[in-house]
């Protein structure tokens, strides 16, 4: 199964389970994929989708570090949860 289908299935499952903490990063990934496809006028394969996810994880890690340094543990915890949710879709 392609990574895009896996993401869409995970979105459906999170919506059915009413799991907002898991749904938010999945929607974010799908939006970033669609944006890149529109901007570059291409259809992304699994490697392209993986690169989008890696970029988003890197952004979240940077935000996590900044929030920790600023003493905003509440926001840092949210970023950590998003990192965990995104890393579940990266290949091992």
Question: What are the language-model segments listed below?
Answer:
Residues 1-92:
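N-terminal cationic and glycine-rich segments that engage phosphates or anionic surfaces
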């Amino acid at each position: 199964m392609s990574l895009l289908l896996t993401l869409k299935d995970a979105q459906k499952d999170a919506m059915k389970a009413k799991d907002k903490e898991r749904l938010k990063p999945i929607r974010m990934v799908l939006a970033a994929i669609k944006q890149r496809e529109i901007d570059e006028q291409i259809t992304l394969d699994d490697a392209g989708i993986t690169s989008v996810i890696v970029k988003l994880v890197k952004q979240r890690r940077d935000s996590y570090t900044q929030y920790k340094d600023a003493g905003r543990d509440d926001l840092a915890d949210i970023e950590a949860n998003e990192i965990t949710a995104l890393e579940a879709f990266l290949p091992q």
